[in-house]
């Protein structure tokens, strides 16, 4: 139990950028994607009962970068501004499209992020 408490303490002290990097490393190590369970949960919930998941979908949206387009540098800059990621992390996200840029945001914020990405030359979807 002492080891688990130490792990919890260490994880609690991580910065947002360090947590994002840890997430990425764990995804690579375990061969999973953090974005996939969110989509699966939404689809699974919709099959269970249409009324409750429909309300949840209306309040939280994910902005997905589907294509970086020809002007990757501007898109990387915009992704950095939106997410607060470092240069390498933003570049990896853009080059790994389709990927979620921002998850669980309001409809207005999702539309704003999508517009910023499209203005930078990328293609994005709000889901």
Curated annotation (Swiss-Prot):
GO molecular function, one term: structural constituent of ribosome
SUPFAM superfamilies listed in its UniProt record: ClpS-like (SSF54736), Ribosomal protein L7/12, oligomerisation (N-terminal) domain (SSF48300)
GO cellular component terms, A-Z: cytosolic large ribosomal subunit
Entry-linked InterPro entries: Ribosomal_bL12 (IPR000206), Ribosomal_bL12_C (IPR013823), Ribosomal_bL12_C/ClpS-like (IPR014719), Ribosomal_bL12_oligo (IPR008932), Ribosomal_bL12_oligo_N_sf (IPR036235)
Coiled coil spans: none
Keywords: Ribonucleoprotein, Ribosomal protein
Residue stretches spanning the membrane: none
Pfam families with a match to the protein in the record: Ribosomal_L12, Ribosomal_L12_N
Gene Ontology biological process terms in this record: translation
HAMAP family: Ribosomal_bL12
Function of the protein: Forms part of the ribosomal stalk which helps the ribosome interact with GTP-bound translation factors. Is thus essential for accurate translation.
Family: Belongs to the bacterial ribosomal protein bL12 family.
SUBUNIT field: Homodimer. Part of the ribosomal stalk of the 50S ribosomal subunit. Forms a multimeric L10(L12)X complex, where L10 forms an elongated spine to which 2 to 4 L12 dimers bind in a sequential fashion. Binds GTP-bound translation factors.
Stated name of the protein: Large ribosomal subunit protein bL12
UniProt source species: Rhizobium etli (strain ATCC 51251 / DSM 11541 / JCM 21823 / NBRC 15573 / CFN 42)
């Amino acid at each position: 139990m002492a080891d688990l408490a130490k792990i919890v303490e260490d994880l609690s002290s991580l910065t947002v950028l360090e947590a994002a990097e840890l997430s990425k490393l764990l995804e690579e190590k375990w061969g999973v994607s953090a974005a996939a369970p969110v989509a699966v949960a939404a689809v699974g919930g919709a099959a269970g009962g249409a009324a409750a998941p429909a309300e949840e979908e209306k309040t939280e949206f994910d902005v997905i970068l589907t294509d970086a387009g020809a002007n990757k540098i501007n898109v990387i800059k915009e992704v950095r501004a939106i997410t607060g990621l470092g240069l390498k992390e933003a570049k990896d996200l853009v080059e790994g499209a389709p990927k979620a840029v921002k998850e669980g945001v309001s409809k207005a914020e999702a539309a704003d992020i999508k517009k910023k990405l499209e203005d930078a030359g990328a293609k994005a979807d709000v889901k």
